[in-house]
């Protein structure tokens, strides 16, 4: 992990596809996609139910920042998913602000527009398939506490992409991200907090790496398997995390203490750009405790660990649109192996002796 005094200015987006285990049959959300111009997409969402819904926008296609709003596949007999090149988040599960929500009244329809070429390399051109599926977390109308989740699945859209135009969109965003200004953002109390979190992260990861091969009950609780291949895979991830968190002068990632890519709204604690190995701690991060002994709590150390799993050099995990212990338990074993909060909560549970 390297600290950086250089800042960038805006890049790409995060992913939030959800667990297949979620039941989508009775959802009141009707979501449809439409391509309006080359790689520009309009998403329409209608509340077909009889009750108003207070939807949590962060990390969804209603988010103003660049997050993974659709899944993109190269068309063919065996569709190949196009790698997502945007931001991955860790979101607070408490003390959320009203601005993070959108009330969708019964019978109401709203739209969101975005360009998929910002965070997907579509420069080869040709036919691509698009769809979005997942779940919106929601709160009761008089609250900002998450009360549950509403699943959704959109239609599939096939579109012909002009590769030259799509490539220019992507290059323009990359060029913007490379425009740097000098700033000493990881200094003072923020620098101290970040260095402490990295040290605690390394300690948590080392303990978790050992438990992966020596604590089958805990491994089964979080990863739903005790096979030697699962244990070895999980141990490898934690060993990589321990290496990344173990140094502030070397490693594959760069740590920032200010919102260099403008994605710290809506309850975001921290975010990562896996394609550039940039990690950002948001203002909310510095309001967390350094390391909590409460079961499944969020703190600075586990937020760092969560974001580390998103790095391609570590695992390249997804969030599947969900956070917390209950969501971890709802996933399949295969999904747990690629889910950031599963690794986070396994390590935290060992420390908190859950």
UniProtKB/Swiss-Prot annotation:
Catalyzed reactions: Preferential cleavage of bonds with hydrophobic residues in P1'. Also 3-Asn-|-Gln-4 and 8-Gly-|-Ser-9 bonds in insulin B chain
Top-level taxon: Eukaryota
Cellular component GO terms held in the UniProt record: extracellular region
GO molecular function, one term: metalloendopeptidase activity
Disulfide links within the chain: 186-257, 264-282
Chain residues that bind Zn(2+): 306, 310
Main location: secreted
InterPro entries, sorted: Fungal_M35_metalloproteases, MetalloPept_cat_dom_sf, Peptidase_M35
Propeptide residues per the UniProt entry: 20-182
Cofactor: binding comment: Binds 1 zinc ion per subunit.
Ranges in coiled-coil conformation: none
UniProt-annotated glycosylation sites, renumbered to this chain: 214
Compartments, record wording: Secreted
Active site: 307
Signal peptide limits: 1-19
Gene Ontology BP terms: proteolysis
Stated role: Secreted metalloproteinase that allows assimilation of proteinaceous substrates. Shows high activities on basic nuclear substrates such as histone and protamine.
Family to which the UniProt record says this protein belongs: Belongs to the peptidase M35 family.
UniProt-recorded name of the protein: Neutral protease 2 homolog SNOG_02177
């Amino acid at each position: 992990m390297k600290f950086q005094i250089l800042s960038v200015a805006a890049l790409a987006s995060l992913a939030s596809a959800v667990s297949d285990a979620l039941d989508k049959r009775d959802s009141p959300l009707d979501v449809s996609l439409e391509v309006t111009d080359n790689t520009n997409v309009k998403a329409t969402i209608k509340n077909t139910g009889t009750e108003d819904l207070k939807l949590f926008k962060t990390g969804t296609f209603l988010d103003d920042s660049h997050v993974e709003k659709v899944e993109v596949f190269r068309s063919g007999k065996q569709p190949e998913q196009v790698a997502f090149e945007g931001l991955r988040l860790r979101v607070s599960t408490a003390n959320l602000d009203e601005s993070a929500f959108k009330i969708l009244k019964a019978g109401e329809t709203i739209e969101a527009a975005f360009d998929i070429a910002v965070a997907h390399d579509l420069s080869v051109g040709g036919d691509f398939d698009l769809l979005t599926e997942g779940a919106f977390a929601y709160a009761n109308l008089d609250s900002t506490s998450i009360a549950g989740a509403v699943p959704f699945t959109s239609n599939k859209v096939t579109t012909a992409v002009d590769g030259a135009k799509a490539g220019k969109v992507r290059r323009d965003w990359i060029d913007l991200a490379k425009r740097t200004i000098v700033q000493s953002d990881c200094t003072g109390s923020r620098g101290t907090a970040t260095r402490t979190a990295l040290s605690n992260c390394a300690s948590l990861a080392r303990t978790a790496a050992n438990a992966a091969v020596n604590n089958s009950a805990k491994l089964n609780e979080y990863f739903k398997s005790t096979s030697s291949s699962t244990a070895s895979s999980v141990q490898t991830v934690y060993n990589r995390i321990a290496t990344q968190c173990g140094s502030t002068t070397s490693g594959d990632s760069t740590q920032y203490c200010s919102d260099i890519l403008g994605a710290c709204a809506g309850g975001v604690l921290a975010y990562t750009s896996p394609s550039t190995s940039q990690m950002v701690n948001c203002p909310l991060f510095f309001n967390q405790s350094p390391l909590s002994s409460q079961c499944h709590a969020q703190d600075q150390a586990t937020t760092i660990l969560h974001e580390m799993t998103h790095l391609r050099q570590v695992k390249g995990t997804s969030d599947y649109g969900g956070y917390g212990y209950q969501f971890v338990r709802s996933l399949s074993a295969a999904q747990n192996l690629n889910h950031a909060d599963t690794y986070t909560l396994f390590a935290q549970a060992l420390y908190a002796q859950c």
